[in-house]
């Protein structure tokens, strides 16, 4: 794995651990999930983001874990993009989920090639 890919992995991991923590522990994210009509999934989503971010870091040492973490996070962000479209959010609101989906799909592709 190249240094550039490692940087993408670490950046994605930091973003997911940070954002997942916000989802779990802040009122603003509680309101967002209510707006999405997905309040009952807020804790699970936050936990998956934090665990996925941690999995990306472990995946730097274990490619199999990187495949699972990046694949799961790419799928989670696909659902995030679909949700943003469904509630008619604009590009600015949708772009973070879209960018993280693409980044993790890229990580997944690299990890699969390394197996």
Where are the language model's segments positioned?
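Membrane-interface extramembranous regions
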Residues: 1-115
């Amino acid at each position: 794995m190249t240094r550039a890919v490692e940087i993408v992995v670490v950046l994605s991991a930091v973003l997911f651990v940070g954002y997942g923590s916000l989802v779990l522990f802040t009122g603003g994210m509680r309101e967002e999930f209510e707006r999405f009509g997905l309040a009952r999934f807020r804790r699970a989503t936050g936990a998956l983001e934090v665990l996925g971010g941690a999995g990306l870091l472990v995946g730097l040492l274990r490619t199999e874990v990187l495949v699972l973490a990046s694949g799961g996070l790419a799928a989670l962000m696909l659902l995030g993009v679909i949700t943003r479209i469904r509630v008619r959010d604009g590009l600015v609101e949708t772009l973070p989920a879209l960018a993280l989906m693409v980044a993790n799909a890229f990580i997944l592709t690299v990890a699969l090639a390394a197996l």
